[in-house]
A protein has these predicted regions:
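Membrane-interface helix-boundary motifs at transmembrane edges
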Residues: 1-6, 31-33, 55-69
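Extracytosolic and intramembrane catalytic regions of membrane-associated proteins
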Residues: 2, 106-108, 112-144
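Membrane-embedded alpha-helical segments of integral membrane proteins
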Residues: 9-58
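Sequence-level detector for tyrosine residue identity
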Residues: 12, 57, 102-103, 125, ...
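Short amphipathic alpha-helical "recognition" segments used for binding
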Residues: 55, 67, 74, 125-128
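Internal/C-terminal transmembrane anchor helices
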Residues: 62-92
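Alpha-helical transmembrane signal-anchor/signal-peptide segments
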Residues: 86-111
Length: 144
């Protein structure tokens, strides 16, 4: 069975296990912090971008003009990743705390997640259990 596990299957299994652990933590009222979700999301997008190129290079002969297309597609993939990341940052009620704007307040042992955009911004405060896990229930909200 181990001979059929490629590096991409192992990575996809790790990403799936992360999401399953997040949902199991959700049963106990806990969640991962945006730090872990941001790394997870970037790793998933990077893996989804690299896998087709590895398949392409395994089935084709190397030519220099492919590098130009790879660089251009890398730029387009980065823009798509940023747009999806920005979308998740502005969704007011998301079960996944993927966010651009968050602050850890160590004195009060809480994390502030800023949701929304410009005119309708919401600051959600969550208690931190440890630096990587927070309580999923919002402690209090401040709306601007």
């Amino acid at each position: 069975m181990l001979k059929h596990l490629t590096i991409f299957r192992i990575l996809y299994l790790m990403f799936l296990v992360f999401v399953l652990i997040h949902f199991i933590l959700g049963l106990f009222g806990l969640a991962f912090t945006p730090v872990l979700w941001n790394v997870w999301f970037f790793g998933l997008c990077l893996t989804l971008f690299i896998q087709p190129w590895t398949i392409f290079y395994k089935t084709r002969i190397f030519q220099w003009h492919h590098l130009i297309f790879q660089a251009l597609s890398g730029f387009v993939a980065l823009i798509i990743w940023f747009m999806i990341f920005f979308f998740f940052s502005t969704v007011p009620d998301s079960s996944m705390p993927i966010n651009l704007d968050y602050y850890v307040i160590r004195e009060k042992n809480e994390i502030r997640i800023n949701r929304g955009f410009l005119l309708h911004e919401i600051h959600e405060y969550h208690d931190l259990v440890n630096p990587l896990i927070m309580k999923s229930k919002v402690k209090y909200k401040i709306e601007n």
